[in-house]
Amino acid sequence: MWRVPRRLCVQSVKTSKLSGPWSRPAAHMSTLLIHHPQYAWLQDLGLREDNEGVYNGSWGGRGEVITTYCPANNEPIARVRQASLKDYEETIGKAKKAWNIWADIPAPKRGEIVRKIGDAFREKIQLLGRLVSLEMGKILVEGIGEVQEYVDVCDYAAGLSRMIGGPTLPSERPGHALIEMWNPLGLVGIITAFNFPVAVFGWNNAIALITGNVCLWKGAPTTSLVSVAVTKIIAQVLEDNLLPGAICSLVCGGADIGTTMARDERVNLLSFTGSTQVGKEVALMVQERFGKSLLELGGNNAIIAFEDADLSLVVPSVLFAAVGTAGQRCTTVRRLFLHESIHNEVVDRLRSAYSQIRVGNPWDPNILYGPLHTKQAVSMFVRAVEEAKKQGGTVVYGGKVMDHPGNYVEPTIVTGLAHDAPIVHQETFAPILYVFKFQDEEEVFEWNNEVKQGLSSSIFTKDLGRIFRWLGPKGSDCGIVNVNIPTSGAEIGGAFGGEKHTGGGRESGSDAWKQYMRRSTCTINYSTSLPLAQGIKFQ
């Protein structure tokens, strides 16, 4: 994702002009963007003015009607009817029935279906990427790259479907076998956030399906059109293969639906992606019923650059990790620790790089930086910048709301704060980078670990010993621990997730498939004798 030639970064943030329909005054716009000829392609994704937000083999919805908006100009796109609690109950029932069919299909055959789902997304990658850009606000190359992640994880899951399983273990008893069996949990509930409305669902959905589960998805209300379009693509694949649509169900909705999922004992695993505050509430509700949860929550990620760091790697890495998706990734770098000997030079280089970021219409292939997702996010940005100033910080770049239609703010660099300032320890989902000086390895490793979250981290150094100390027990306490690359851009082949208040869950690659299955330890006696534990003998 975000592979854009450096030559395109030529227009200043502060002098950029937004052009095209994204920046037209409201007087020039009709009621809904979907009515405009330039958005006719939305119909190729099965979208229309009014969309049903419930799918369980058929489309419906009896809940509230909401309108989704384009963050680049805050114009309405289309409407979606959400799920009612009655819709939810019906969908759960149909999903449970669909599981009886899906679980009986051999894992490699399930993998073939998932591969076909990936192929279907590959065919729609440009259209769906444009929709992600339109409704979420990220630049087009990121929107397309996000859909590519779904394609990639489907390819990965298809191969994995032929490899999942447990070991055969040596038994202490003659004539006995000791094996591990892995079976599906049943119904996996998936609640995703606005910032990756396709990819995070894909990480969960593809792996959950090949492990024999059915899925119930609630996406973010503000990206409901993406949820509907994604589900339509999957539903067509299931229909073409004569399978129940309720294998992959959708219930668009708000907190009432999310709370119901968290409390529902029929939801065998609930995967939740969102804020730490809401995630804690979800975890408590699931734990209260002794259920399983998979949490991907906040991140207060750091990059550390030592005196021997290659600055030609550091500067673009920080730029990518700090302003990509306008600072709205869970892996966005929010803290930058620079050795005192290189601090001033790196800050100067970053200010120069920031001044060349091209801002504007997210569909323009030259653009590298789009809007925040909502007006509320803009307000949080403003409050965070003001609070940073009050706590002793100096804004050396940006810090203001941009005078353009839409939710645009300047990418911002703040220096001069204490490493443990309250605002630094608070995750603000916006492009604000706090920069600090450090003197030695021990103190900066401690600073990296002192925040409550533990998602992603990276150091830049050529010192081999330092690298392995960073990876070791006294190094980073994060789930993602990088060297000489950004905090963002995780590959699907590795397990994605973090520690501490990030939630502890793991998704996507490696052995994350185990999260979606239950393990049974099985002892099989194939002899004619019965050796009992502790040598007990019944006469």
UniProtKB/Swiss-Prot annotation:
Class of enzymatic activity (EC top level): oxidoreductase
State the superkingdom.
Eukaryota
Pfam families, A to Z: Aldedh
Question: What pathway annotation does it carry?
Answer: Amine and polyamine biosynthesis; betaine biosynthesis via choline pathway; betaine from betaine aldehyde: step 1/1
- Which residues bind (S)-2-amino-6-oxohexanoate per the record? 331, 489-490
| GO MF terms held by the record | aldehyde dehydrogenase (NAD+) activity; betaine-aldehyde dehydrogenase (NAD+) activity; identical protein binding; L-aminoadipate-semialdehyde dehydrogenase activity
Does the record's keyword annotation contain Membrane?
no
Q: Which residues carry this modification: N6-succinyllysine?
A: 86, 94, 97, 537
- Give all N6-acetyllysine modified positions: 86, 94, 97, 462, 500
Cited PROSITE patterns: ALDEHYDE_DEHYDR_GLU (PS00687)
Keyword Electron transport annotated: no
Q: Where does NAD(+) bind?
A: 192-194, 218, 258-259, 274-279, 296-297, 427
This entry's Enzyme Commission designation comes to: 1.2.1.31, 1.2.1.3, 1.2.1.8
Q: Name one GO cellular component term.
A: mitochondrion
Reaction catalysed? nonanal + NAD(+) + H2O = nonanoate + NADH + 2 H(+); (S)-2-amino-6-oxohexanoate + NAD(+) + H2O = L-2-aminoadipate + NADH + 2 H(+); betaine aldehyde + NAD(+) + H2O = glycine betaine + NADH + 2 H(+); an aldehyde + NAD(+) + H2O = a carboxylate + NADH + 2 H(+)
The cross-references to InterPro entries, in alphabetical order and at most eight, read: Ald_DH/histidinol_DH (IPR016161), Ald_DH_C (IPR016163), Ald_DH_CS_GLU (IPR029510), Ald_DH_N (IPR016162), Aldehyde_DH_dom (IPR015590), ALDH7A1-like (IPR044638)
Query: What keywords are annotated for this sequence in UniProt?
Result: Acetylation, Cytoplasm, Mitochondrion, NAD, Nucleus, Oxidoreductase, Transit peptide
Task: Read off the transit peptide span from the entry.
Answer: 1-26
* Record: active site: 296 (proton acceptor), 330 (nucleophile)
Where does the record place the site Transition state stabilizer? 195
Q: What does this protein do?
A: Multifunctional enzyme mediating important protective effects. Metabolizes betaine aldehyde to betaine, an important cellular osmolyte and methyl donor. Protects cells from oxidative stress by metabolizing a number of lipid peroxidation-derived aldehydes. Involved in lysine catabolism.
Protein family per UniProt: Belongs to the aldehyde dehydrogenase family.
**How does the annotation summarize its subunit structure?**
Homotetramer.
What's the protein here called?
Alpha-aminoadipic semialdehyde dehydrogenase
Q: Which organism is it from?
A: Mus musculus (Mouse)
